[in-house]
From Swiss-Prot:
Oligomer and partners: Component of the RIX1 complex, composed of ipi1, rix1/ipi2 and ipi3 in a 1:2:2 stoichiometry. The complex interacts (via rix1) with mdn1 (via its hexameric AAA ATPase ring) and the pre-60S ribosome particles.
GO terms (BP aspect): rRNA processing
Protein name (database record): Pre-rRNA-processing protein ipi1
Annotated segments matching region Disordered: 1-22
Subcellular location per the Swiss-Prot or TrEMBL entry: Nucleus
SUPFAM superfamilies: ARM repeat (SSF48371)
Function: Component of the RIX1 complex required for processing of ITS2 sequences from 35S pre-rRNA.
Annotated organism of origin: Sclerotinia sclerotiorum (strain ATCC 18683 / 1980 / Ss-1) (White mold)
Main location: nucleus
Record keywords, A-Z: Nucleus, Ribosome biogenesis, rRNA processing
Family stated for the protein in its record: Belongs to the IPI1/TEX10 family.
Amino acid sequence: MGSSARKKKEKKKDFQKTKLRVGKTKAKADNFTDTSFKSKSIVVNQQSLTTSAPSNVVQFTHYLSLASSSKSDTQRKDALSFLTTQLSSQPVNEAIPLPTAVILPKLLPLILDGNASVRSQLLKFLRLLPPADIGDRVESALLYTRAGMTHLATEIRVDALAVLEWLLQVAGDDVVSCPGGWVKTLKSFMSMIGWTTSSATSKWSSASRVSFGISRASFEKSGKTLPRQLLVLSQFLKAGLVEPDTAAQPTTSDNHFPLFDVERHMIPSRANAYAHLNLFGSSRDEEGEMYIDREDRQRVFHKRFQADVVTGVEHAKREAGEAGRAAAVLTKVLRDGMNDYSGVDDTQ
């Protein structure tokens, strides 16, 4: 009897509800597994969680490296967009995070980039750089600009003209007076437009405006390539041949008596003021020479380019439309820049 009553009591345990008492926790099940854990830190691979954010200089350097070396078009464009935003949002009187001498050598090769968005974003960034810092770097900038002007792709040639236009706005005097800035750039214009003189017949030719094996249809597929080229050429010739308004104003000796030509004896305001003398550099040819004076630029232009340009302008006027209007602007620049050239002192 005792054993059977005990067995019945044990069976009833499985079906009895446990009464909870105040102040006592519920009993844990027999198959309970403790899943709680304690951790003092969380480690995430390839990430660094710090209390202080990187400085503007560090961020600028990082994105500058991405813009200049990344193989992804999207990444280069986004990096340039970040750099543009950072420059445009900083105070006017605050210096840029990195010197222009460090920025330009890294970004100038992007003038020849195959992606149109990258080139467009590059031009927006270049326009935010301090104009005073561009003059001493014009020579290196023109190397890539001239390469873009004679590129096989039409879009790159058009964007290279926009870069040259920006250079003329911020440092026009340096563009036309730096080594190779006058003759080599004019040769690039002549090759790009197709105004060339045949060496065999010594006759001006623009048969199909062919350059590097490209037909006129491909060269001007946008319909506005030639007018754009003529307008930028007008700006370039105006910077090199036309006297500034301040210099063209007549002055009387009474205004400056007893001091004459004071500005010629002042301390030069530009770096390497005697670079045109080429005292210690390698010998230069006519194309790589520096033409500081307006008279020298007039002489070289008259000797090598004026006849072809005048003939090309006359042909462009016959096309009427935008090309004709651009040719009229170029004609006015030629008249203002060369009307006082006599060629008497041309001994070369």
